[in-house]
């Protein structure tokens, strides 16, 4: 039996975050504050000596991952499976614009993991496409948790994806998924996967160790 630590880090601030604009899979860049947030998170997480860093291929996540990689001499690989929720016709709109377009739907979507914006994904969809990323890491990293169980694999991604993947790994009832609230920019979650030395994803029992941890107190939870 061994314990595998999985850290999931949200990207730093973008202008869309600052403007309460829903990005989804639009490729947006970090602001100056976002770069500073990424550097602060990197300073803390580098001390954990990550064994692997896998990032969404969207710029805001990749640049956040690069800040960490530069501090711990680990290269960054990317996986499209870690992209943010596709928000369909809501992408690029502010919260107010979405509420005017579809009154009540944004709150309903937040409260129900099975709902998706028109042309977009539900949280169930997001979990289904991101779980294989973790399964692939288990296959390709047989020493994960064997040499030093505190050395994590770090996924750098997006708030919606992190919440969906966390809920799925914890095997929460779908109607309880919204209990996981928003994450601040450059904040992270940590899960521990308990299972046999040679394990597939379904063999692990996951526990939530940390949610919305940050190098600094933040009021940007969106």
Give the positions of each predicted feature.
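GST superfamily/GST-like fold recognition
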Residues: 159-163
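Active-site signature of alpha/beta-hydrolase-fold catalytic machinery across serine-
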Residues: 67, 164-168
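Extended, charge-rich low-complexity interaction segments
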Residues: 108-118, 215-222
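Phosphate-coordination/substrate-recognition cap region in phosphate-metabolizing enzymes
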Residues: 39-106
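Loop-to-helix element that buttresses phosphate recognition and phosphoryl-transfer chemistry
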Residues: 7, 13-68, 114-131
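Acidic, low-complexity terminal tails and accessory targeting/binding regions
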Residues: 1-4, 74, 88-97, 139, ...
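Short, conserved phosphate/pyrophosphate- and ester-handling motifs at nucleotide-, phospho-/glycolipid
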Residues: 11, 158
């Amino acid at each position: 039996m061994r314990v595998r630590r999985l850290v999931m880090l949200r990207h730093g601030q973008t202008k869309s975050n600052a403007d309460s604009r829903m990005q989804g899979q639009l490729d947006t860049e970090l602001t100056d504050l976002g770069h500073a947030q990424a550097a602060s998170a990197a300073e803390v997480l580098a001390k954990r000596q990550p064994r692997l860093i896998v990032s969404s291929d969207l710029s805001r996540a990749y640049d956040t991952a690069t800040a960490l990689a530069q501090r711990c001499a680990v290269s960054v690989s990317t996986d499209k499976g870690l992209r943010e929720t596709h928000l369909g016709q809501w992408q690029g709109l502010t919260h107010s614009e979405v509420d005017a377009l579809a009154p009540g739907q944004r709150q309903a979507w937040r409260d129900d993991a099975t709902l998706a914006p028109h042309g977009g994904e539900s949280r169930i969809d997001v979990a289904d496409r991101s779980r294989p990323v973790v399964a692939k890491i288990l296959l390709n990293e047989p020493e994960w948790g064997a040499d030093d169980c505190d050395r994590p694999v770090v996924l750098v991604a997006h708030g919606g994806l992190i919440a969906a993947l966390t809920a799925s790994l914890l095997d929460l009832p779908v109607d309880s998924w919204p209990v996981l609230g928003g994450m601040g920019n450059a904040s992270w979650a940590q899960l521990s996967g308990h299972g046999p030395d040679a394990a597939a994803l379904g063999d692990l029992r996951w526990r939530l160790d940390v949610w919305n941890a940050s190098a600094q107190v933040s009021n940007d939870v969106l």
